[in-house]
From Swiss-Prot:
Catalytic activity: 5-O-(1-carboxyvinyl)-3-phosphoshikimate = chorismate + phosphate
Role noted for this protein: This reaction introduces a second double bond into the aromatic ring system.
Protein name (Swiss-Prot/TrEMBL): Chorismate synthase
Cofactors demanded by this protein: FMNH2
Cofactor note: Reduced FMN (FMNH(2)).
Protein species of origin: Chlamydia caviae (strain ATCC VR-813 / DSM 19441 / 03DC25 / GPIC)
KW ATP-binding (keyword) present: no
Gene Ontology cellular component annotations, sorted alphabetically: cytosol
Family to which this protein belongs: Belongs to the chorismate synthase family.
Keyword terms, alphabetized: Amino-acid biosynthesis, Aromatic amino acid biosynthesis, FAD, Flavoprotein, FMN, Lyase, NADP
Assembly information from the UniProt record: Homotetramer.
Gene label: aroC
Length: 359
């Protein structure tokens, strides 16, 4: 089982949803980076439950630094981070342990490995993404040294959506962070949709967009290591992710070349582009424009409506998430922090690779 992501800057996550703790080991972080346990709090709080319409599971998600930091600075050695699971309730999973959960990876996992941890999804649980968010904090610090910043936000939930990519600014970022749903969409409309889902015991998918500051470093390579290819690999590894696009993406199939192609212009005595339909990447390499993309998330599979299933002995049965179960009606809201982290992790790795591209 592969639990490592990245090349020069890499992370290895470990732990299960209902185990004592989860964690991550980060390799390749340069020495001298300022790092304090409090640096993790803002990002971890954006992923944590507790917002309106999210899972009632209450995890403090305090990040403990076990290695790789001395006197507030990274030492260049592996950084080990640990997050304790403090609100585990396994009883609801034991009650239906004899049958497969529709929409989950339990059956596939068992067929591949011969056994499975059924408690909260075990290793395949979205609980693992807390480790990615923690590692993403360190990646963001590396990128900040090169004036590269990323912001993710909920751009679609139900009928509410924003199709364009706003320009990244401190004001826009603050508006997103101040929103209970990390979204520029109407908060009242989102809350109404989530309340309806909870009343109907149902769930809904969503879309998370990400935008960056202009990336003047030439990140990515022209063949297998295209920036969008590495982003797709990382972002599509997020639980419940079902689609990825960069720039105009799938909408470009409805465009003429004369409409889609971004013209080159001179701006402030530098070569720039008059539009950014490409999403900031040409030939798989960033070209000084913002990097923009979207990730589609499926509806949460854990809902209280009953579904046909089979038992582990092959008998027809019914599966319904218990009333005591704690799940999100829309995973895309809490996935915002995870998308932002994965983009930062990919870009930090590509940035360090770029340092080795030529003399």
């Amino acid at each position: 089982m592969r639990n490592r992501f990245g090349s020069l800057f890499s992370l290895t996550t470990w732990g299960e949803s209902h185990g004592p703790s989860i964690g991550v080991v980060i390799d390749g972080c340069p020495a001298g980076l300022l790092l304090d346990p409090e640096d993790f709090i803002p990002a971890m709080s954006r992923r944590s439950p507790g917002r309106p319409g999210t899972s009632p599971r209450k995890e403090a998600d305090i990040v403990h630094i076990l290695s790789g930091v001395y006197q507030g600075k990274t030492t260049g050695t592996p950084i080990s981070l640990q997050i304790f699971n403090t609100d585990v309730k396994s009883a609801t999973y034991h009650q239906q342990e004899d049958r497969y959960r529709p929409g989950h990876g339990q059956l596939a996992y068992e067929k591949k490995y011969g056994l499975v941890d059924p408690l909260g999804g075990g290793r395949s649980s979205a609980r693992e993404t807390a480790c990615r968010v923690a590692a993403g904090v360190i990646a963001a610090k590396i990128l900040a040294h090169y004036d590269i910043y990323c912001l993710a936000f909920l751009s679609k939930l139900g009928k509410e959506s924003i199709e364009t990519y706003p320009k990244l600014s401190k004001e826009f970022a603050q508006n997103i962070y101040n929103s209970p749903f990390l979204s520029p969409l109407d908060n009242d409309s989102i809350l109404q949709t989530l309340t309806h889902l909870q009343n109907e015991q149902d769930s809904l998918g969503g879309v998370v967009s990400f935008i960056t500051s202009p990336i003047h470093e030439s990140l990515g390579e022209p063949v297998f290591n295209k920036v969008q290819a590495v982003l797709a690999s990382g972002l599509m590894s997020i639980p419940a992710a079902k689609g990825f696009e960069i720039g105009l993406g799938f909408a470009s199939t409805d465009s003429y070349g004369s409409e889609y192609i971004d013209p080159f212009i001179i701006e402030n005595e530098n070569i720039s582009m008059g539009s950014n339909n490409c999403g900031g990447s040409l030939g798989g390499i960033t070209v000084g424009m913002p990097l923009n993309g979207r990730v589609a998330f499926k509806p949460t599979s854990s809902i209280r409506k009953p579904f046909l299933t089979v038992t582990k002995t092959g008998e027809p049965s019914i599966y319904a998430t218990q009333k005591e179960g704690r799940h999100d009606p829309c995973v895309a809201i809490r996935a915002v922090a995870v998308v932002e982290a994965m983009v930062n992790l990919v870009l930090a790795d590509l940035l360090l690779q770029q340092r080795c591209a030529r003399l």
